[in-house]
Amino acid sequence: MDPLHVLNKEERWVKVPIRIHKEPIVVKVQATGTTDNPTFLVELDEVDPAIHELIKREICRIFRWDISLHAIHEHFQKTNLKQIFEEHYGTPIVLDFHPYNSLVKCIIHQQLNLKFAFTLTQRFVTTYGIEKNGVWFYPLPETVAKLTVEELRALQFSTRKAEYIIDLSKEIQKGNLHIDSLYEKSDEEIMAELIRYRGIGQWTIQNVLLFGLGRNNLFPLADIGIQNAIKKLLQLEQKPTKEEMEAMLPEWHPYLSYASLYLWRSIE
């Protein structure tokens, strides 16, 4: 579990750090219903009532309350993923709290074991982000753009990763990359735009599309975890080839992102 998340599993709540017009706001979201009849209680900081609708929209986006998990579950009952969808019934895709956070986190996590990746991300956020009511907010791009490679190296970043994150943040600050405009673009347009930046490859973009922007039909074929999950589920002697996985995708379409999530869950 991400150590930056502030939550209570027993009481079923999580505190969500969001920014409206760059202002940090902590929103407490508590599950009060059931898997089949989900309801939620949302508690806000004292904020201007004029932005309540913006906050509501952002929380709905993060938790994907517009998506019917029942319809997705029914879709996979007719596929070879039926077993894992029954075992993990009702598991939603919950998004990273902002696409910029998602991009930075994915760059940090590249080629690291999960434990150290979380540690490094936590160091970065708690050193350069801000804390409010016990909840940490990622630093804004303009803050990161002012950092030096040496400052991130002191946190145990590699030189290249430090350069990638600082350079990306500078491009956002200059207005060359508009993060919020990604919501309106197709997967292909986003791939073509982000691939131009150093340190951002196909794996990173696919993860940002899935967990940063909430696209429903993403399946990272090169992901080792997914390959191992398919091998385990289908009792294969070796990991499936790219061609073998591609042959499975039409059956799972148009919910490939949920196939990805449930395959990951099956090997946790």
Which functions belong to the PLM regions below?
Residues 1-268:
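HhH-family (HhH-GPD) DNA N-glycosylase catalytic core used in base-excision repair
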